[in-house]
């Protein structure tokens, strides 16, 4: 027997309603995936259960891209329509509020998914997309971290080179100043030695020459008083010799 037509009304039995929802949801997601592959269409599907759980499907890697595309398209259509009354303005504000509220809820839900929370309502395909997004984000984070570390290392190397060059220049200046100070010190010492040279000692005569009056012929020994001049002169009288000879002949 063929399958009969299902009557379109609310299922009163909670268990049957939950089972039907699970089956129909899986079929709906499958059909959305098939039409996106076969027709190369951009498909997004959002389903809330009667308990408030969210189920979604997106042919793109990120649901936000599809929603942004939809928002741009709907905004462009609204711009073509000229509002003619205050009622239209109020309606636009209500639509904008609903849109922003839905977007905030979607962002909060995605944030929970990125943190590993509330994953029970996500299908395998969605988990795979989430995993790919996290891997891509992790690669970007690691690449940025490595770039910052490389830049920091290069900065430290340049700083080290500058410090070494500065130290070398300071050491050279210190050596030059020390050389100048040593030169000034040597010049000062030479000038001091030239100003304090001891007088040359006077030559001293032999004491025998100084005490012998016969070696000072009519002169005066340096250091003697003038009264010794008469004593130092050579006595050339022959009286003692003459007296000596007379005594010899007398004998």
Swiss-Prot record:
It is found in: Nucleus. Residues 90-180 form the K-box domain. Its main location: nucleus. Expressed in some of the meristems of arrest-stage broccoli heads. The keyword Transmembrane does not apply. GO terms for molecular function: DNA-binding transcription factor activity; protein dimerization activity; RNA polymerase II transcription regulatory region sequence-specific DNA binding. GO terms for biological process: cell differentiation; flower development; positive regulation of transcription by RNA polymerase II. CDD domains: MADS_MEF2_like. Homodimer capable of binding to CArG-box sequences. This is Transcription factor CAULIFLOWER.
């Amino acid at each position: 027997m063929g399958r009969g037509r299902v009557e379109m009304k609310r299922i009163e039995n909670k268990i049957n309603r939950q089972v039907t929802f699970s089956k129909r949801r899986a079929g709906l997601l499958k059909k959305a995936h098939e039409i996106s592959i076969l027709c190369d269409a951009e498909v997004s599907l959002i389903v809330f259960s009667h308990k408030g759980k969210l189920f979604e499907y997106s042919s793109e890697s990120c649901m936000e891209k599809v929603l942004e595309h939809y928002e741009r398209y709907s905004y462009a259509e609204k711009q073509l329509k000229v509002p003619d009354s205050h009622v239209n303005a109020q309606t636009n504000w209500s639509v904008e509020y609903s849109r922003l509220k839905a977007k905030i809820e979607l962002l909060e839900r995605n944030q929970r998914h990125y943190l590993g929370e509330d994953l029970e309502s996500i299908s395998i395909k969605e988990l795979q997309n989430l995993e790919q997004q996290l891997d891509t984000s992790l690669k970007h984070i690691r690449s940025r971290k490595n770039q910052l570390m490389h830049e920091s290392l290069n900065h430290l190397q340049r700083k080290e080179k500058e410090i070494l060059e500065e130290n070398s220049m300071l050491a050279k200046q210190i050596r030059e100043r020390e050389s100048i100070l040593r030169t000034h010190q040597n010049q000062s010492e030479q000038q001091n030695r030239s100003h304090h040279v001891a007088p040359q000692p006077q030559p001293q005569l032999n004491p025998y020459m100084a005490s012998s009056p016969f070696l000072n012929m009519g002169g005066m020994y340096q250091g003697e008083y003038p009264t010794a001049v008469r004593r130092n002169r050579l006595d050339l009288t022959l009286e003692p010799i003459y007296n000596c000879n007379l005594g010899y002949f007398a004998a």
